[in-house]
Amino acid sequence: MKQYNAIKVKYPDALLLFRVGDFYETFGQDAIKTAKILGIILTKRGAGSSSETELAGFPHHSLNTYLPKLVKSGLRVAICDQLEDPKLTKNIVKRGVTELITPGLAIIDEVLSPKTNNFLAAISLGKQIGISFLDVSTGEFLVSQGTKEEVDKLLQNFNPSEILVSKQKKESFSSQFSYPYQLFYLEDWVFQHDFSIESLCTHFKTKNLKGFGIENLNDGVIAAGAIMHYLSETQHQKINHITFLKRIPKEDYVWMDRFTTRNLELFYSNNLNAVTLIDVIDKTISPMGGRLLKRWLAFPLKDINEISKRHEVVKFLMEDLNSLNQIQHHVKLIGDIERLISKVATFKISPREVIHLKNSLEAIIPIKSIAEKSINTSVKEIGLNLSNCDELRKRIKETLLENSPVNILKGNSISSDYSDELKELRRIAFSGKEVLDKMLTRESEATGITSLKIASNNVFGYYIEVRNTHKDKVPEHWIRKQTLVNAERYITEELKEYESKILGAEEKIMALEIEIFNNLVQWLGKFIKEVQNNSFLIAKLDCLSGFSQLAIENNYCMPLIDDSYELDIKEGRHPVIEKQLKAHESYISNDVFLDSDKQQIIMITGPNMSGKSAILRQTAIIVLMAQMGSFVPAKSVRMGWFDKIFTRVGASDNISMGESTFMVEMNETASILNNISGRSLILLDEIGRGTSTYDGISIAWAISEFLHDNISKPKTLFATHYHELNEMTSSFKRIKNFNVSVKEEKNDVLFLRKLVPGGSEHSFGIHVAKMAGMPNQVLKKAHMILKKLEKSHSNEELTGKVKSIKEDHQLQFFNLDNPILEELKEEILNIDINSLTPVEALLKLSELKKKIDN
């Protein structure tokens, strides 16, 4: 245990798998955890002695079965292997940790999800917050820096499996980022700028980082350097597939804070078994395409030209169904070449996976041919940039057998035609039947024993078996090996020599196959960038083909995007809700029009369950889908591009931070109001409902007024129960009232789910309570109370008070009866601003301020 303890002390945070012969063993607390997670037997080592300790283990060949379960449980697992052949040493076998598997550094297929990246992140808390992401399974390495809100958003989009943070900044990180991330703390010296630059330049073999366009991202570079250090610390030395460090160009993408991503349920939902947007729009076929689609959804584009290029490809493939079908057919034959080529770099690839890589690259050839002939410029460009990888495919075909096994140690991976030496060794090893038949015939004739049999087993090797009735005919030079009830087994010098020859050939075959395969994998490393480029192009084409398939299946339209400030949606639908309707049901579509001049804010009133929230969400989703390059669920859409999408929809507590539902709502709304622009789309649902009625109306009114009067004029949909807000349209020219209509029939209400002009006077909350099965006694009492409240608190009374506050505020502001204010007014009016220099203007402003202060 001395050797084990010496290694374990170096990896106190990891579960240590200690190789002992044919088993991986765990001891002590590690054994208790292992037995519980894997469901294997927990035993004792040295039971009853002073060195007694828990023990649990499994066969070494079962590592790929058990390791994923340990990593998925959130453990860091250190694999300690035997570094020398036990047969060649008389001392304790030398052992060492060959790899440290962590949640963020997993390249095991059983741990990874095909259409989801597995990112490791590092965060540097400096002047700005630096952040870097690495998916070691694909080689994608990204860097950025920014504010807390920007980094928070990136964390939600990339959803890292593990985050590296400085030990000294532990509390600072926890106070800013409250989500339950898997964290690992590194020493503070790792997060140094010079150290990071040196680490990155050493890996990329460059003198500086200017070629990556990140030299000004000091905090981002520090985060990226921390990741490189972590790779080294965890024994990940073979990382040639990490070929580039890319800046995340935040200015190119639509800004959506983490609340918006959550509220729109793009990737996740708080409701169990709920369908998300990605579930509906993902028509990709390849793993690479699935991963890229998630990136496109998280980062919609702002550049009209780039968006239009995607739309044109989708349109082209919809019109050329033959090309679409052919492309999708061949993409199905392509495996995850991005992760396969990463396995080449890390030497974790199997013979069967190399064959899979070759077959996948062969499936690219017809795709390249189709794309090159395309009349669409973007598709043609993809075709021209795809590589046939002729040399790579040829070498694999010459070297490996098509039915190569998963493990090189199983043998029969290398083609005999590739090596004359291998061919000869196989002839010796596998032509044994012919040799043994000749030997059997010769010995039978010499002894006169017709029932002789030559066979072998793992214990005695080859032998000649003679039944007892003929054992008196056995020659003296035969050597007895084993006695059975009815027979005797012998060996001869000739048979012994032959056995030695066969066993020697089999060992040499195995060694030669391993050598040839390792040389092949090393040679394949030259094509990493070429295959990675193919992977990206196929992923891109897969996404666009998926958009075409999506539009065909669901009758989506091509949105028209321009530089205007309008949003004009005709018969828009919610893509997720419409897919969940029953066969006989149809989705009630709705029109939405917003601009900066006449209809900047739409105030939507209507009953509970009438569909207000759905209209808000579908508007945002249509804009988002349009700017990610997809067609959209509507009859037509014409829109100016948006740079920010904000949503405040739904309610949730943040108990861990001590925040109520109302506080969370106010935080999210404040974030929106502090970050709006002229190209923002804002969706607000039931703002102010978490407090008293008067507080709620006051807050909702003030927010609406702020948005209306703001110079940016952000386009806004505001769904509310406060019917008093309908009065705002008379005072604010760009606020228009709409309601989600209902039809009252006797004591029943029919939700029509249609957005129509005009405000609504009723919420029908009691009717919804009735639908929920509320007792009649409660419903009757509620109805009586409602009638009394409606009489005592009329809309006119409430809105009159709000309007008078606004008018009083304006009168007070412009009341200039005060002599000092009158003097200031005259002085300001007499200033010739055209002749003032900037410095003189500042001095004049300072002078006026002093007069007011005095």
What are these regions (language model features)?
Residues 1, 17, 28, 60-67, ...:
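Amphipathic alpha-helical transducer elements in NTP-driven molecular machines
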Residues 1-316, 325, 329-332, 336-345, ...:
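Charged catalytic and DNA/RNA-contacting regions of genome-maintenance
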Residues 12, 28-29, 217, 285-286, ...:
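ATPase nucleotide-binding head domains, primarily ABC-like/P-loop NTPase cores
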Residues 103-112, 238, 375-378, 437-449, ...:
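Active-site phosphate-binding and catalytic loops of NTP-dependent enzymes
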Residues 191-199, 255, 266-268, 359-434, ...:
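Amphipathic heptad-repeat alpha-helical coiled-coil/stalk segments that mediate oligomerization
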Residues 346, 350, 360-363, 416-417, ...:
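Charged, surface-exposed helical/loop "interaction arms" that form contiguous linear patches used
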Residues 401, 484, 488-521:
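Extended, charged coiled-coil "arm/hinge" scaffolds of SMC/Rad50-like chromosome-maintenance ATPases
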Residues 457, 829-854:
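Terminal-proximal interaction/regulatory segments of ATP-powered molecular machines
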